[in-house]
């Protein structure tokens, strides 16, 4: 399996290391030429969503990524990736990838000092370790999206077709 990892900013190295431990072949997407490589899936890592969005636009990657997902490409977005994939972000109106029927609250768990670790049941997976770093949470999902995990009454993982998002870092 060949996985493209968006490597513009954020925790892309950590995602690559884990994917490689699982036997996947990874390559970094830093520019449009990288995006042209064949891929089985895309990972959008945690980081700063506004910085990632600016770079996606500046590097002419936003539309190709959106089209890939809209045409059935598999994607996993963590933390900032969740924000970029969500159609709605509470209190914000600007263009994102916006392919997932979710509404998100940014930085919902507060500042860096509010970061925490939890373990919770994830539908179809079992108990999953979850690291929340200035994390968002999913306020609501609309069909065909479905909630997969809840922590303290907040949705922290969801899927829609071949899209998977988590508020936490795996």
Where in the sequence are the language-model features?
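N-terminal beta1-alpha1 cap of cysteine-dependent amidohydrolase-like domains
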Residues: 1-58, 63-68
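Flexible, glycine-rich phosphate/dinucleotide-binding loops
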Residues: 12, 35, 84, 91, ...
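Flexible, charged surface loops at secondary-structure boundaries
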Residues: 35-38, 70, 141-142, 159
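Redox-cofactor binding/interface segments in oxidoreductases and associated redox assembly factors
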Residues: 43-44, 77, 166
């Amino acid at each position: 399996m060949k996985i493209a990892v968006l490597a513009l900013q954020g925790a892309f190295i950590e995602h690559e290391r884990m994917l490689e431990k699982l036997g996947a072949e990874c390559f970094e997407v830093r520019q449009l030429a990288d995006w042209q490589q064949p891929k089985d899936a895309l990972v959008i890592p945690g980081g700063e969503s506004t910085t990632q969005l600016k770079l996606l636009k500046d590097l002419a990657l936003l539309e190709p990524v959106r089209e890939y997902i809209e045409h059935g490409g598999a994607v996993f977005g963590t933390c900032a990736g969740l924000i970029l994939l969500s159609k709605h972000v509470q209190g914000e109106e600007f263009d994102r990838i916006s392919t997932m029927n979710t509404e998100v609250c940014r930085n919902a768990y507060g500042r860096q000092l509010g970061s925490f670790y939890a373990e919770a049941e994830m539908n179809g997976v079992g108990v999953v370790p979850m690291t929340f770093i200035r994390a968002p949470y999913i306020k609501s999902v609309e069909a065909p999206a479905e909630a997969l995990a809840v922590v303290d009454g907040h949705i922290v993982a969801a899927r829609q077709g071949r899209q998977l998002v988590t508020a936490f870092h795996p």
